């Protein structure tokens, strides 16, 4: 996969997904952002970041009942390795 740059906010959302170690819903992501990083972003703002991350290939989503869950497609180690290769 070619390197895709993340914004600081997108990277923060990905950190929540990576730290959780499981698929997250929007509500779970909101709670982690608030509890771990002090970000009290609105639901639509986080939804937009999640959509951008899907478009960039970092996440996929699936639906269970009425809830969408977000699954990481790129792990933290792969992301960091690609950042390092880009830097060098």
Predicted regions mapped to residue ranges:
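A short, structured beta-strand/loop element
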Residues: 85-87
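Short, cationic-aromatic polyanion-contact patches
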Residues: 64-83
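A short, conserved structural fragment
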Residues: 54-64
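Short, positively charged loop/turn segments that connect secondary-structure elements
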Residues: 34-46
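Short alpha-helical segments that sit at the start of domains
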Residues: 1-16, 20, 75-78
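Short acidic, hydrophobic short linear motifs in intrinsically disordered regions
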Residues: 23-33
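Short, hydrophobic-biased segments on the C-terminal half of alpha helices
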Residues: 47-51
């Amino acid at each position: 996969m070619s390197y895709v740059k993340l914004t600081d906010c997108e990277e923060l959302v990905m950190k929540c997904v990576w730290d959780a170690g499981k698929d997250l819903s929007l509500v779970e992501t909101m709670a982690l952002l608030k509890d771990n990083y002090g970000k009290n972003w609105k639901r639509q703002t986080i939804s937009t970041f999640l959509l951008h991350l899907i478009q960039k290939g970092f996440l996929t989503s699936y639906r269970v009942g009425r809830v969408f869950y977000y699954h990481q497609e790129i792990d933290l180690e792969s992301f960091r390795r690609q950042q390092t290769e880009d830097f060098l």
